[in-house]
Amino acid sequence: MSDYLELLPAVDITEGRAVQLAQGVAGSERTYGDPVAAAMRWQEAGAEWIHLVDLDAAFGRGSNRELQAEIVGALDVQVEMSGGIRDDESLAAALATGCRRVNIGTAALEQPEWCRRVIAEHGDRVAIGLDVRGRTLAARGWTKDGGDLYETLARLDAEGCARYVVTDVNKDGMLQGPNLQLLRDVCAATSAPVVASGGVTTLADIEALMELVPVGVEGAIAGTALYEGRFTLEDALALTRGGR
């Protein structure tokens, strides 16, 4: 386990643009320009990770694969790639970009046998995205229910999943603060590290997440708050890293 909270600024892409959605709803996006420039801006501000999402692939309406590869190639920092990774071909393409790890979401729910094999073959280059409403998982770009969170977590733990990215869908993009109780509950149910996503709005939210590092929260994804200027990445990193 890490002894500090890793911050992962998000770069979410749709139709070649950097966007942020409200509660993951297609059509709710606010646009923030060129995703390559956004990723470079976060790197220059001191980020050691970028959370890179292809929303078109997640919604099954196309892909931004070449653009994702361009972004990974332009960066010197580590990239966690997400969105539409559901079969051997899309997984191979994602890994071939040189990203450090991929997030698998829907496929972990709809194709458990494939997911088991991928976890066994790729180890900590694979994280499982658990997108949650209450106790229920959301799939297919958060448009379909995907079963019980804790039953799925137990199955994935037994298969050796190295890491979970846990998103409270109702919090995502809403600037209302993270769901700390959900994160505590997930950390209590698994020994694997957890990356928190959804709701980070203020530096106080980051401080609250830092308090969960000892129970298993390894990192936090920040998106809308950064793009809307609620705090700067430099200030957030100074907070999480302390004297590091």
UniProtKB/Swiss-Prot annotation:
Task: Supply the enzyme class, top level.
Answer: isomerase
Q: Does the keyword Transcription regulation apply?
A: no
Pathway-wise, it operates in: Amino-acid biosynthesis; L-histidine biosynthesis; L-histidine from 5-phospho-alpha-D-ribose 1-diphosphate: step 4/9
GO annotation, biological process? L-histidine biosynthetic process; L-tryptophan biosynthetic process
What are the UniProt keywords, alphabetically?
Answer: Amino-acid biosynthesis, Cytoplasm, Histidine biosynthesis, Isomerase
Q: Which reaction does it catalyse?
A: 1-(5-phospho-beta-D-ribosyl)-5-[(5-phospho-beta-D-ribosylamino)methylideneamino]imidazole-4-carboxamide = 5-[(5-phospho-1-deoxy-D-ribulos-1-ylimino)methylamino]-1-(5-phospho-beta-D-ribosyl)imidazole-4-carboxamide
Identify one Pfam family in the record.
His_biosynth
Q: Name the source's superkingdom.
A: Bacteria
Q: Which GO terms describe its molecular function?
A: 1-(5-phosphoribosyl)-5-[(5-phosphoribosylamino)methylideneamino]imidazole-4-carboxamide isomerase activity; phosphoribosylanthranilate isomerase activity
Which residues does UniProt mark as catalytic? Answer: D12, D131
**A GO CC term assigned to this protein in UniProt:** cytoplasm
The record's subcellular location field reads: Cytoplasm
Q: What Enzyme Commission number(s) apply to this enzyme? A: 5.3.1.16
HAMAP family listed in its UniProt record: HisA (MF_01014)
Stored PANTHER family: 1-(5-PHOSPHORIBOSYL)-5-[(5-PHOSPHORIBOSYLAMINO)METHYLIDENEAMINO] IMIDAZOLE-4-CARBOXAMIDE ISOMERASE
Family (UniProt): Belongs to the HisA/HisF family.
* Descriptive protein name: 1-(5-phosphoribosyl)-5-[(5-phosphoribosylamino)methylideneamino] imidazole-4-carboxamide isomerase
